Regions:
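Membrane-proximal, glycine/serine-rich, low-complexity loop/turn segments characteristic
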Residues: 1, 7, 13, 19, ...
Length: 229
């Protein structure tokens, strides 16, 4: 019996069949735990008196957001801010951003003094690549059957790494899964089964949640300070 999280870690290549038990058939076997239904997954096994068969699969995928927000540039932000500030006042007030500052920012004459930063483009990449590889072997003799599978997953994120920095804040997740089903027939009526699934992995990433990073980017001022000093 495994959880839904463990079920996600079973390689698709290792699944032979699955079925769903509902209603009385589920509760009769699993009691209250089967009240919402039970999924039975049967993993692959080797066959007697067959030669070893090796299967290898390699996948690469590219993920890209379908829609991304468009942010106002620095000059547009400053003009809009001045208009909103004036709209809230009954009298004429001195704008926060003068015409000289707006013009200097628009010209890009000195990005350190007059920054104009697209924080979304600075922090996030347009897409990310993920990889998955699986190798499994199965076979058997007159008394022994075996099936073994090894899978490696590599997932990355959308965070950019600065060209002038050795630190990479992006998500870097490696996961390795091993599974085996070994059966040994002691007698015509007795069989010993060894079934094992093991997992090991490593994950690196920012301390902040991705949603927090998105939120900070949404509220970031494009003209407050430059990205690099």
């Amino acid at each position: 019996e495994i959880s839904s999280g463990d079920l996600n870690r079973i390689p698709a290549e290792s699944i032979e069949s699955f079925s769903v038990l509902k209603d009385a058939s589920a509760t009769a076997i699993y009691g209250n735990r089967g009240a919402n239904g039970v999924m039975l997954v049967k993993t692959k096994h080797g066959k007697e008196n067959t030669k070893a068969t090796v299967n290898v699969s390699v996948e690469a995928s590219y993920f890209q957001p379908m829609n991304t927000p468009e942010f106002a540039d620095g000059p547009t932000f400053m003009r809009t801010y001045n208009e909103a500030q004036q709209a809230r006042s009954a009298t004429v007030i001195t704008p926060r951003y003068s015409d000289e500052i707006i013009a200097a920012t628009e010209s890009g004459i000195n990005p350190y003094v007059y920054p104009n930063v697209d924080w979304y483009d600075m922090i996030f990449r347009s897409g990310n690549y993920n990889q998955r590889a699986n190798v499994n072997v199965s076979g058997g003799a007159s008394r022994v059957t075996y099936y073994m599978s090894l899978q490696a997953n590599h997932d990355t994120g959308l965070l950019n790494a600065a060209d002038n920095s050795a630190f990479n804040p992006n998500i870097n997740h490696w996961e390795y899964n091993f599974q085996n089903n070994i059966s040994y027939k002691l007698t015509n009526t007795t069989t010993v089964n060894l079934r094992m699934m093991a997992q090991i992995g490593s994950q690196k990433g920012p301390n902040n949640k991705t949603t927090d990073i998105y939120k900070k980017v949404m509220y970031a001022n494009p003209v407050s300070f430059p990205a690099y000093f």
